[in-house]
């Protein structure tokens, strides 16, 4: 019996260790309340209109009735965060066990630890500014879709699930199309190349992407609520919950245009965001640099131009992040999603045995064996950063900027 339990612990060591680590972080660091700016999405449902962000409230009301207690919503968020921790851990363990080569296994383990220690680990979703964000459910969906891709063999069932879950996720928040949809595009691109450009596969992949794009466009431009007066909407919502609702998100989402968002939220702070954004990118070079290095190895090792093109197109899926960085001011959320998707892409392609990524992981594993201290320092370095917030920048980024500014002033004698 003891031997059997020991074998199970050894087999599922990654899942167990990652789950315990994440759940422990959730236990000791979770914010005490749902962030005020997002709590309204737990109350709004389809009785108020039709469109994105109304799905979550509708689902909750199926179980709670017409009145939602604040404590109920908070417990729901905690439960979903716990599920996310388990899903990420299971995904990591699946990939680790699939690696048979020792170097690839070591590289996969490094990427898992590297991600869990990074500012974009699931722990960013229970910081004060992100507690209860709809990004939680988008992340859960992205992990589930990755698992479906890895485990479901039937092509038609797989893409039906992609379409249904993708549309459901967009109904939770249409920003999915910019934040996590790139990971789904990478999977469809891999399928197209893997099929040898079979017409049926191309049609299925493109149709899925097109239909999800149509769902997004409808949710973004053709949906809305049945209220023309903000005060009436707030009064009606407040009568159905004990949550102290925040008015600004309702006004911004349903009574502003995209132009209003840009000029009222983004433009006044754009210079500061660009400044701190550049510093964030610079300080987190070890993270994105590691992923980019693997992609470059995959491109270099491509046996022909067609193989190289696949990886270039996969990299270009990241262009989807440009609109949200340009138009919306929650740069912490955008950075977090970007790094999450890079991690998911590596895990999925490693699991399915993509040749280029496999060669990149093998080289990474060999590099880790030659210089383990360097990679340990990388992990310790990224672990020194706090987790991404919503609007605010990483504390270390701001300190770096002001310390550098003070140093410059001291050198110049000002």
Where are each of the predicted segments found?
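Transmembrane-helix motifs of polytopic, lipid-linked glycan transferases
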Residues: 79-104, 144, 148, 292-293
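Perimembrane helix-loop-helix junctions
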Residues: 180-209
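Membrane-lumen/periplasm interface segments of specific transmembrane helices
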Residues: 24-33, 201-291
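Short hydrophobic alpha-helices at membrane interfaces in multi-pass membrane enzymes
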Residues: 151-167, 197-204
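Membrane-water interface signatures at transmembrane helix termini and the short loops
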Residues: 123-134, 278-350
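Membrane-interface alpha helices of multi-pass inner-membrane proteins
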Residues: 158-175, 179-185
């Amino acid at each position: 019996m003891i031997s059997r339990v020991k074998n199970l612990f050894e087999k599922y060591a990654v899942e167990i260790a990652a789950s315990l680590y994440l759940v422990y972080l959730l236990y000791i660091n979770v914010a005490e309340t749902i962030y005020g700016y997002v709590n309204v999405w737990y109350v709004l449902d389809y009785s108020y209109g039709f469109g994105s962000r109304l799905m979550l409230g509708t689902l909750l009301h199926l179980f709670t009735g017409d009145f939602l207690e604040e404590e109920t919503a908070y417990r729901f968020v905690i439960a979903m965060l716990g599920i996310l921790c388990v899903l990420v851990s299971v995904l990591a363990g699946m990939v680790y066990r699939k690696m048979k080569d020792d170097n690839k296994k070591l590289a996969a383990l490094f990427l898992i630890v590297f991600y869990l220690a990074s500012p974009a680990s699931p722990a960013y979703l229970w910081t004060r500014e992100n507690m209860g964000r709809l990004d939680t459910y988008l992340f859960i969906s992205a992990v589930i879709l990755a698992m479906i891709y890895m485990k479901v063999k039937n092509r038609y069932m797989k893409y039906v699930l992609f379409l249904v879950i993708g549309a459901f996720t967009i109904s939770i928040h249409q920003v999915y199309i910019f934040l996590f949809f790139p990971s789904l595009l990478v999977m469809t691109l891999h399928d197209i190349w893997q099929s040898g450009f079979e017409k049926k596969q191309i049609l299925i992949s493109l149709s899925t992407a097109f239909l999800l794009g149509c769902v997004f466009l409808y949710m973004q431009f053709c949906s809305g609520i049945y209220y023309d007066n903000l005060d009436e909407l707030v009064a009606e919502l407040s009568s159905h919950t004990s949550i102290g609702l925040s008015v600004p998100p309702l006004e911004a989402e349903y009574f502003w245009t995209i132009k209003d968002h840009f000029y009222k939220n983004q433009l006044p702070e754009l210079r500061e965001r660009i400044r701190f954004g550049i510093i964030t990118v610079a300080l987190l070079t070890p993270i994105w640099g590691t992923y980019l290095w693997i992609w470059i190895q995959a491109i270099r090792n491509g046996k022909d131009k067609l193989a190289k093109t696949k990886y270039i197109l996969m990299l270009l899926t990241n262009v989807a992040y440009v609109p949200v960085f340009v138009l919306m001011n929650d740069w912490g959320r955008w950075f977090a999603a970007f790094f999450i998707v890079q991690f998911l892409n590596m895990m999925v392609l490693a699991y399915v045995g993509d040749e280029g990524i496999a060669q990149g992981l093998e080289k990474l594993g060999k590099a880790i064996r030659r210089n383990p201290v360097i990679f340990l320092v990388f992990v310790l370095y990224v672990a020194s950063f706090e987790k991404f917030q919503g609007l605010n920048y990483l504390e270390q980024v701001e300190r770096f900027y002001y310390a550098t500014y003070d140093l410059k002033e001291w050198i110049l004698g000002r």
